[in-house]
């Protein structure tokens, strides 16, 4: 059983930190915002709530929601241009401080790559450090499904990405930070998990995370010591 002080040491000495995106790095759930633009917000946010609670296998929940939304390429571009996601207060400073310390920062999301890459660019995170789901479109821009081969399309996908990062870059200590059950499940293989409740509190995560924060300032403070 890792103590809180050991967790703090792990975070302080980590060589890689992975963040979830929706409701963690950004304030919104990207899929719900996309549903809003496509006019099916209510039905989809109810499905998201069920999926986040871990009641439905991730890929099934994603397939079901996307079948309802049917987002076109143009609608995705419109979302990014007209209603870009809002960064969670403190995240820009935290990522920048980690990068100054030569810590590799990754975004691992069950959301969509086009939206997550936009978020990454605001945080100076290279697109190569982004793992997310890819939407597919027909030549006329209509929705054609999503790439089911991405690890993030599966339940347990975030853990698969972290395992892959360890194998590829030989990281000694990887920290996963996120708001949801799928983030908590990624530890192990992550060496530590920090639950984040600054945008939404998921009771299951709050109850089970050994370290739970509601403000990124707390983590910034850990790096100053």
Swiss-Prot record:
Inhibited by calcium ions. Keywords: Acetylation, Amino-acid biosynthesis, Cytoplasm, Disease variant, Hydrolase, Magnesium, Metal-binding, Serine biosynthesis. It holds the Pfam family Hydrolase. The keyword Endoplasmic reticulum does not apply. Its EC number is 3.1.3.3. The active site is at residues 20, 22. The modification N-acetylmethionine is found at residue 1. One of its GO terms (molecular function) is magnesium ion binding. CDD domains: HAD_PSP_eu (cd04309). Changing residue 32 to N: In PSPHD; decreased L-phosphoserine phosphatase activity. Phosphate binds at residues 53, 182. Changing residue 182 to V: Reduces L-phosphoserine phosphatase activity by about 25%. L-serine binds at residues 20-22, 109-111, 158. It catalyses: O-phospho-L-serine + H2O = L-serine + phosphate; O-phospho-D-serine + H2O = D-serine + phosphate. Pathway: Amino-acid biosynthesis; L-serine biosynthesis; L-serine from 3-phospho-D-glycerate: step 3/3. Its cofactor is Mg(2+). Transmembrane segments: none annotated. SUPFAM superfamilies: HAD-like. The keyword Hydrolase applies. It is linked to Phosphoserine phosphatase deficiency: An autosomal recessive disorder that results in pre- and postnatal growth retardation, moderate psychomotor retardation and facial features suggestive of Williams syndrome. Homodimer. Belongs to the HAD-like hydrolase superfamily. SerB family. This is Phosphoserine phosphatase. It comes from Homo sapiens (Human).
């Amino acid at each position: 059983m890792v103590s809180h002080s050991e967790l703090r040491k792990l975070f302080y000495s980590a060589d890689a930190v992975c963040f979830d995106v929706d409701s963690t790095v950004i304030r919104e759930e990207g899929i719900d915002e996309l549903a809003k633009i496509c006019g099916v917000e209510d039905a989809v946010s109810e499905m998201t709530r069920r999926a986040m609670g871990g009641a439905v296998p991730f890929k099934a929940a994603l397939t079901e929601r996307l079948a309802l939304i049917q987002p076109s390429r143009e609608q995705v571009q419109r979302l990014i241009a007209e209603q870009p996601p809002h960064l969670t207060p403190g995240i820009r400073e935290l990522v920048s401080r980690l990068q100054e310390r030569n810590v590799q920062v990754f975004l691992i999301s069950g959301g969509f790559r086009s939206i997550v890459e936009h978020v990454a660019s605001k945080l100076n995170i290279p697109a190569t450090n982004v793992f997310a789901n890819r939407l597919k479109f027909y030549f006329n821009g209509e929705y054609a499904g999503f790439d089911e081969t991405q690890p993030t399309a599966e339940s347990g996908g975030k853990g698969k990405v972290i395992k892959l990062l360890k194998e590829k870059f030989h990281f000694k200590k990887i920290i996963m930070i996120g708001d949801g059950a799928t983030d908590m499940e990624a530890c192990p293989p992550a060496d530590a998990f920090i639950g984040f409740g600054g945008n939404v509190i998921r009771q299951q995560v709050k109850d089970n995370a050994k370290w739970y924060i509601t403000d990124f300032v707390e983590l910034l403070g850990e790096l100053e010591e």
